[in-house]
Amino acid sequence: MEMMPFSLLGFGFLLGVKHAFDADHVAAVSTFAAKNNSIKKSSLLGMFWGFGHSIALLLIGLVILSLKITIPENISLSLEIIVGVMLVILGVNTILTANKNKIHFHKHSHGQERHIHFHSHKATKNHAHEHLPFYQSMFVGLVHGLAGSAALTLLVLAAVKSFWIGLIYILIFGIGSIAGMMAVSSIISLPFTLI
């Protein structure tokens, strides 16, 4: 086995973190992060999303590295369409949840200073705590990982000659993706902690 260059590991990690900040990833995880007012819980949702995403990348990466194949373009496009439909469904669900929870804002002033406060009147009678959908977040990450796997694996196949180096690269990329998603979901939830 050839020596794994540290620069490739670092590059894989940084690409994973950057990958988490892609617009479609932010849109997907924001639908979960917006449903709670805890940075810790949002971070966990991001972690599970990143874990699902990384599992998909790892499984497809293993197949591609083992068989030395690429994903056909028609399959890649089909997976992208599935992710697009999933994002629309998540967006509609977020709008319906905001409506159900009666999220709104109030304009008012303190002396000369005018500002806006957002808040919610949840439509539950007993104000029961909702269980966070960690498995849902992981499933969305898994589906998202299927769609993004083509670009990652082409990059890996072009850059490395060894199965093991490719596998380690995908694992490091996944760890970066998980760390990035935890950061993204924490940042997104910050305003909701103030509601």
Model-derived segments and spans:
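Transmembrane helix boundary and interhelical junction motifs in multipass membrane proteins
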Residues: 21-27, 146-154
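Transmembrane-helix boundary and interhelical-loop signature of multi-pass inner-membrane proteins
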Residues: 61-86, 156-166, 171-174, 179-195
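Alpha-helical multi-pass membrane helix bundles of inner-membrane/thylakoid proteins
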Residues: 96-145
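Small-residue-enriched transmembrane helix starts and helix-helix packing motifs
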Residues: 1-20, 42-47, 128-143, 168-173
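Juxtamembrane helix-boundary/capping and inter-helix hinge elements in multi-pass membrane proteins
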Residues: 32-42, 159-163
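Select subsegments of transmembrane alpha-helices in polytopic membrane proteins
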Residues: 48-56, 136-147, 180
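Membrane helix-loop-helix hairpins that form the core translocation module of multi-pass transporters
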Residues: 11, 41-116
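Divalent metal-coordination and catalytic microenvironments
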Residues: 22-25, 53, 88, 144, ...
